Amino acid sequence: MKKKLYEGSSKILYSAEEDFLLIMAFSDKAVLETGETVDISGKGVLNNNISSFLMDKLEMIGIENHLIEKINMREQLIQYVEVFPIQVIISSVACGRFVKEFGMDEGYVFDKPIIDFKVRSREFNYPIVNEYQISNFGWLTMDEIRIVKAQTLRIYDFLSGLFIGIGIRLVECKLEFGRVFNGEESIIMLTDEISPDNCRLWHINSNEKLGFELIQNEPNKAFESYQLIANRLKEK
């Protein structure tokens, strides 16, 4: 019987039969900015499909990630990764904090994508942290930071093109990375998920918000939005 190891806001981790492997289950839960938890029936199934599809695509272009295989409607078999205590957020359009903190017009397109690092801590409200702090805190070496930034740009470039092909703009994406050890050596590996839960996705023509942003404002329409994204990706 699998043992529950961790339960987050939208995913649950279980033990697997083999060492250094885990089972990751996608739930229907979503935590709003107010802290309220809501259930969007069927969201977990769609996120499992979307994330496994996108991780497979990234593997094909040489981005190593934790996905081994999708094992059922809600669960994936994944590689154990020692996850870094940071999130990597890459944005190509003014949204979220750029509007709130800098007073920018939502939708303003940056000349180049902007990469931010945030501490993975809900308790401290995910504070921004810079490269020198990350290095001095001993979380990543400067060389690891360089690799993470390069991979983030490559992932974003690839996913942006893929989403444009289905009429959706990838405005912002939140990624997580970690280390996988092989003896004394380690490699950087993409982990967590890539889904409408951690990507800002807008209709390319109307800028209508899709995915998690819709849950925040119009939760009754959220499932249809996730379904739209999954269906369009299925056609690729």
Curated annotation (Swiss-Prot):
E.C. number: 6.3.2.6
Known pathway: Purine metabolism; IMP biosynthesis via de novo pathway; 5-amino-1-(5-phospho-D-ribosyl)imidazole-4-carboxamide from 5-amino-1-(5-phospho-D-ribosyl)imidazole-4-carboxylate: step 1/2
InterPro entries to which the protein is assigned, alphabetical: SAICAR_synt/ADE2_N (IPR028923), SAICAR_synt_PurC (IPR033934), SAICAR_synthetase (IPR050089)
One GO BP: 'de novo' IMP biosynthetic process
Keyword ATP-binding attached = yes
Q: Which UniProt keywords apply?
A: ATP-binding, Ligase, Nucleotide-binding, Purine biosynthesis
Query: Which reaction is recorded as catalysed by this protein?
Result: 5-amino-1-(5-phospho-D-ribosyl)imidazole-4-carboxylate + L-aspartate + ATP = (2S)-2-[5-amino-1-(5-phospho-beta-D-ribosyl)imidazole-4-carboxamido]succinate + ADP + phosphate + 2 H(+)
Q: What cellular-component terms does GO give this entry? A: cytosol
Q: Does the keyword Nuclease apply?
A: no
Q: Which Gene3D superfamilies match?
A: ATP-grasp fold, B domain (3.30.470.20), Phosphorylase Kinase, domain 1 (3.30.200.20)
Annotated GO molecular function terms are: ATP binding; phosphoribosylaminoimidazolesuccinocarboxamide synthase activity
Q: Identify the domain of life.
A: Bacteria
Q: What family does the entry list? A: Belongs to the SAICAR synthetase family.
Tell me the PANTHER family matching this sequence.
Answer: MULTIFUNCTIONAL PROTEIN ADE2, SI:DKEY-6E2.2
- Name recorded for this polypeptide: Phosphoribosylaminoimidazole-succinocarboxamide synthase
Specify the species: Rickettsia prowazekii (strain Madrid E)
* The encoding gene: purC
